[in-house]
């Protein structure tokens, strides 16, 4: 199943003082909806507040995407009207952009000039009078349903090779499992002012890996879980957070705490706890921060593990941390 993430934000040009009425710097006098499409684990739709778009077009688009085996999650919690700097940064960083134009006159050439970094730009026109190349695109499609279906078909082709969820690293003879950052529970990860999501590309196959970049938090908490049924019984594994800290990182004078809990089928638990300094890793490449080790139990007694990294020193403003995910891998 191909999966992709989409961020939808309604921008309204001119007038009004409400949270959804702002001046758009990208397209003058244009009502439009931008989807910033980056490599994520689900199709995440931040709904427009405009009734016609959110209840009409998007409600139609959702089942069409699902029929094309693209998972959909509707998010109605997106911050609107404020803090748009992060939104435009995500648009600039994205490899695929899907723009929905509605009830306005606009020039598609302007959008392309402001999104030159994208590999693909896919437009959807909804009650719009178009000029320039956009008019030719609009007139080439007989109806909105055909246009949406063609856009979905293009997305499916472009995203066929995206790996999502818990996956096994594709290294030779590797039995390492990875829980990506998107699968972790992270404090304030849904807030753009606190975290920015982006994609990196790694060899050997240049697959896109989504990472979370910390802008600012005072209370840090990251946790996730994994089931040992996927592991080789009797093998000793380490559980490590894969992180990096850029040169501008701050607020890491105090150590972070880590723990690994294994919950057995009979309800008994084992807990490992430790602390370590992240400050000494500032400016380095990816580093492994170990949460603990375990020996995989027999599959008929498979257990669930949970892993956590936290630091609750609220007087420290923490920034600069980049999180790739958590690796569970055999120890040498």
UniProtKB/Swiss-Prot annotation:
GO biological process, any: signal transduction
Gene Ontology molecular-function annotations: carbohydrate binding
Top-rank taxon: Eukaryota
Any single Pfam family the record assigns to this protein: PP2
Occurrences of domain TIR (ranges): 38-163
Transmembrane segments: none
UniProt cross-references to InterPro entries, sorted A to Z: PP2-like, PP2-like/Lectin, TIR_dom, Toll_tir_struct_dom_sf
Name of the protein in its database record: Uncharacterized protein PHLOEM PROTEIN 2-LIKE A7
């Amino acid at each position: 199943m191909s999966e992709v993430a989409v961020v939808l934000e309604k921008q309204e040009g001119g007038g009004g003082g409400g949270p959804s009425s702002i001046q758009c710097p990208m397209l003058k006098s244009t009502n439009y909806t931008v989807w910033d499409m980056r490599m994520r684990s689900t199709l995440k739709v931040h709904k427009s507040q405009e009734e016609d778009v959110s209840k009409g077009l998007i409600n139609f688009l959702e089942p069409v995407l699902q029929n094309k085996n693209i998972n959909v999650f509707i998010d109605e919690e997106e911050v609107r009207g404020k803090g748009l700097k992060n939104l435009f940064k995500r648009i600039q960083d994205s490899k695929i952009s899907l723009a929905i134009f509605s009830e306005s006159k606009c020039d598609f050439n302007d959008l392309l000039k402001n999104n030159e970094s994208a590999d693909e730009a896919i437009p959807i026109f909804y009650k719009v009078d178009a000029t320039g190349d956009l008019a030719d695109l609009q007139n080439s499609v007989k109806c909105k349903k055909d246009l949406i279906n063609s856009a979905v078909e293009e997305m499916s082709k472009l995203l066929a090779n995206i790996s999502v969820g818990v996956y096994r690293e594709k290294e030779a003879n590797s039995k390492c499992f990875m829980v990506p950052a998107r699968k972790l529970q992270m404090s304030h990860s849904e807030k753009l002012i606190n975290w920015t999501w982006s994609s990196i590309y790694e060899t050997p196959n240049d697959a896109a890996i989504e990472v979370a970049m910390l802008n600012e938090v005072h209370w840090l908490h990251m946790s996730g879980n994994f089931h040992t049924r996927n592991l080789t019984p009797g093998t000793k594994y380490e559980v490590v957070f894969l992180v990096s800290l850029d040169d501008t990182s701050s607020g890491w004078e105090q150590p972070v705490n880590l723990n690994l809990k294994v919950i057995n089928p009979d309800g008994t638990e084992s807990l490992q706890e430790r602390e370590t300094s992240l400050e000494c890793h500032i400016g380095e490449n990816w580093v492994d921060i170990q949460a603990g080790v375990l020996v995989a139990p027999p599959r008929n007694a498979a257990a669930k593990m949970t892993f956590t990294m936290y630091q609750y020193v609220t007087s420290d403003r923490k920034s600069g941390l980049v999180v790739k995910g958590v690796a569970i891998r055999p120890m040498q």
